[in-house]
C-alpha cells in the first residue's frame, strides 16, 4: 500500500523516546547482559530501519520475524547481528549465510529436511529454540537439543545461542512463568555443549522478572514506551510512548435531528449538531469497532459517530471548527491524552495489535 503523504493523517515517531526507553531498561538489568532490539513487524509499526539505526550505538543486535525483514536491515546498512525468530526452511539458507543472518532452528525435522535436500550449513549461525510451554515452536528435551546441536555441527553450522519464550511474563499470576523457567533451566543443565548465549527475557521478563535473566534480553514493546501487560501491572520505571497519530478535519457541517451518519445508518442525530470528517479509516488500521470511541479536538474528547469507513470517520463536534483543525487519535492534545493502551482496552485487545495494524498508508514522520 502506498504511503499517502498528500493527506493530513500522519504517525509521528519520537526516536529519542525509543532510545531513552531502551536505556531505562538497560539500567534495570544486570551488567554485561546482551541487548537485542526486537524490530519485527516494521518495529511494531514504528519503522524498522529508522528505529534500528537510532539504536545502533545502544544494542548488540536485532530480532526480526523472517528473512525479508532481516534483508531489509542489511540492505539499509545495518551490520550488527540479526536474529530471525521464526523458522527459516533449509531451501532459504543461502541468503541467510551470504548476509550473515542468524537463524532459529526449532526441530529435528528441520535437520532431516536439510539432509534430504542436501543442504550444507557451513558458515550458518544458529540459535536453537526451546518450547518451555509456549506451545508454538521449539524442542522439548535436553536429549533432542543435544542431538540437534551435534547434527548442526556435523553440517558445519555455528550454534551460538539457545532461547525460549515465556507465555505469561506479563501477568500477575507467575505460576506458569515459574513452570516454564524451571523447565528451561533443567533443559539447559542437561546440555552437553551449551551455546554461549542463553536468553529467555522478553520485555515483560526484563522489567518484572529481571532476577531471572540469563545473558541476553529481547526488548520489544517496552522500547516503544508501552506497558507489556496493558494496564494489569505497574511499570517499575516511567516510559515514553514513542508514536502519536494525528490528522485534521477536512469537512465540517451541521446535521439536524433525525439525520443519519455512515454506512448502515447506525447513528441518528437526536438534535442539531456539528459533524466533522477525518481522513482515516479501517484501511489505515483504525478498525470499524472504534465507533463510539473518542478522539481529541481542541483539547476536547469528540465521539466517533457512525461506522468507521475504509478511508474516513466522522466525529461529533462542539462547534464549527475550521478545516485543517488538528485531530489527535493517539497522543496529547492540550493536556488531554489518548494512549495506545486506551485504544486496546476499548477494542478488547492488546496495545501490540493496535500499533501493528497501523498500515503503511500512514506516513511515519521522524
UniProtKB/Swiss-Prot annotation:
The active site is at 40 (proton acceptor), 263 (proton acceptor). Its EC number is 5.1.1.1. It is an enzyme of class 5 (isomerase). Catalyzes the interconversion of L-alanine and D-alanine. May also act on other amino acids. This is Alanine racemase. Gene3D superfamilies: Alanine racemase (3.20.20.10), Lyase, Ornithine Decarboxylase, Chain A, domain 1 (2.40.37.10). It holds the Pfam family Ala_racemase_N. PANTHER family: ALANINE RACEMASE, ALANINE RACEMASE, CATABOLIC-RELATED. The gene is alr. It catalyses: L-alanine = D-alanine. Pathway: Amino-acid biosynthesis; D-alanine biosynthesis; D-alanine from L-alanine: step 1/1. GO terms for biological process: D-alanine biosynthetic process; peptidoglycan biosynthetic process. Keywords: Isomerase, Pyridoxal phosphate. Its cofactor is pyridoxal 5'-phosphate.
